[in-house]
Amino acid sequence: MYIALLGRQPEISLAELAAVFGVDNVNRISQQFAKVQTDQFDITTLGGTIKCAKVITEFPASRTDKASLLAASRFITQHYQAKWAHSPHKITLGLSAYDLTVSARDVQKTGLILKSSLKKSGTSLRLIPNDQPALSTATAHNNKLGNSPHKVELLLIKTTDRRLIIAESRGVQNITAYTRRDRHRPKRDAFVGMLPPKLAQIMLNLALGAGSLTGQKSCGNSVTRSASSLSDKSMVLRTALPDAFDLEEMAGSRPVVTILDPFCGTGTVLQEALLAGYDVVGTDLSQKMVDYTAENLSWLQSTFTTPGRPVGRVIDIHQADATTHRWPNSTHLAAVVCETYLGQPFSAPPTPQKLAEVVGNCNHIITGFLTNIRPQLAPNTPLCIAVPAWYDASGQATHLPLIKNLQKLGYYQLNRTPLIYRRPDQIVARELLVLKSIGKTVPQA
């Protein structure tokens, strides 16, 4: 059993966990956390999880948060005194408390008590200082907490049903790696938008685990589904892949999984797909973007390929209009993942007339794309596409009209709740649509 610290957009983080592990195995336990029933949890494959930790114990919370912390402190001291006594390794320890009204000093006391106790048995412990009750992502990452049995972060979480969970970190979001894959690429273009690599990673997981989102509904703080468990990648692929796709087709010993991005821009979706081991096809209306993508993917392959970690293959990158193009072998695509045309950027809410113009333009282009590609896809091909949504000063959103007509366009929408990726005060947000193609494939002439 694991717990996951959700990202800034918790609904998106939850949807990703549901797609990867299966909704029956994901339960929201607080505003910030979900519990995940699984034996394995690799945080590097998830863009929406900030920290993950293995549950060590849980018990009813006390009447006050300070009493709960005291009970947790007793357990931690007893459990880890026995575990680490006479350890030949120096222990690095961090402590984080969530949803407990306690001070950083109160949390630190638990570590100091354990440090003193271990010193008597000859074990050296370095305690990471707290300036807040919970350690930041950067602090946990920079101290490599969760990366080895000797570098540990203990998470104390009070749940909404008043239980106290003590969990041992198994990793934190690698902010250094994301920065390298984003800002260190040879080609970037702020004008066309810069899709964060972790959002691209989320979108790939949503698409390839799309089958697990079917029938998703809210049930208190939990997320439920009727499909089978998707706790490993092969099961995710078997649930999500289109009818015409043959998972047994192999390249060496690796299943052939091909991702298409018809709006590839600078190649962020494709690079994350390559790192996950998938083959990629990319197109863009702009030859400049095609050139940028090709250079970025070449950099990625030369930078990140190692003997123990091969990346996927670049099958084709070329210039094409997504509203009219015919993609070769499109019935064999595993998924379509893309950030579509987001329209004009705004630093302040536009006038109603300007907004109507931009909405109409984006709606026309994206409708044209969905109409064009649908008959080229095998039935049940999953898509995860980012489309624009516009927010006014009061926080009210304007959505694309096409969202209400997806079935007429030949798609089922699998996410039942809106998945909005947006910074505070951002005018143009990204709305994620998780879709499945319906209808028959039209043979190419």
Language-model features, listed with the residues they occupy:
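Class I S-adenosyl-L-methionine-dependent methyltransferase catalytic core
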Residues: 1-55, 63-71, 99-113, 137-153, ...
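Short, charged beta->alpha transition segments
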Residues: 66-86
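Extended, charged/glycine-rich binding lobes that contact polyanionic ligands
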Residues: 110-131
